């Protein structure tokens, strides 16, 4: 009889240890996703912020220039990605604390709120930039806006590529919110 009750006690403690392992795994995944989102937002902000192209027109003295700062939407894109990148970098130590102390509830709740705010910032920046990129490629016949990508092809390729990192960061922030919700629900 005594042997069977001891066996039952050990089996009750096994899920508790595995719960800590799962919690630590969630925290490690949180840290990895933050690094990926940092890379995406940083690359997008730098690439967009350094995008420009100059085309000569008849002579060397008359030139047409396209740069990201010509469009306020693309400037907002750079600012939004820079802010989100700075936040994600500053949140790394807190994410490391969650790996060490998986029971930190209030700091995880703070990260949920701030992650949601950063998602709310990067989403309109990326979406508005996507609309401008679409107009640059296709134009708008009704508004008499011509597509500029036939002339400024390098500029258009670069601003199109910048969207990838930003939309990737959006996905990472959504996954971070889901992971934090899972971690908070387990407590």
UniProtKB/Swiss-Prot annotation:
It is a multi-pass membrane protein. Residues 1-20 are annotated as: Disordered. It comes from Zea mays. This is Casparian strip membrane protein 1. One of its GO terms (biological process) is cell wall organization. It comes from the Eukaryota. Glycans are attached at residue 52. Regulates membrane-cell wall junctions and localized cell wall deposition. Required for establishment of the Casparian strip membrane domain (CSD) and the subsequent formation of Casparian strips, a cell wall modification of the root endodermis that determines an apoplastic barrier between the intraorganismal apoplasm and the extraorganismal apoplasm and prevents lateral diffusion. Keywords: Cell membrane, Cell wall biogenesis/degradation, Glycoprotein, Membrane, Transmembrane, Transmembrane helix.
């Amino acid at each position: 009889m005594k042997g069977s009750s001891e066996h039952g006690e050990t089996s009750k403690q096994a899920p508790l240890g595995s719960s800590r392992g799962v919690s630590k795994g969630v925290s490690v995944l949180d840290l990895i996703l933050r690094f990926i989102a940092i890379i995406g937002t940083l690359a997008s902000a730098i690439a967009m912020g350094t995008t420009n192209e100059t085309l000569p027109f008849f002579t060397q003295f008359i030139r047409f220039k396209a740069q990201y700062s010509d469009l306020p939407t693309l400037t907002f894109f750079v600012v939004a990605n820079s802010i989100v990148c700075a936040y994600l970098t500053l949140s790394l130590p807190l994410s490391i604390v969650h790996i060490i102390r998986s029971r930190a509830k209030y700091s995880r709740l703070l990260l949920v709120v701030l992650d949601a705010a950063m998602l709310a910032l990067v989403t309109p920046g990326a979406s508005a930039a996507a609309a401008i990129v679409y107009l640059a490629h296709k134009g708008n016949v009704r508004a008499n806006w011509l597509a500029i990508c036939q002339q400024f092809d390098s500029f258009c390729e670069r601003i199109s590529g910048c969207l990838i990192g930003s939309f990737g960061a959006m996905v990472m922030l959504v996954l971070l919110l889901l992971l934090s919700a899972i971690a908070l629900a387990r407590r």
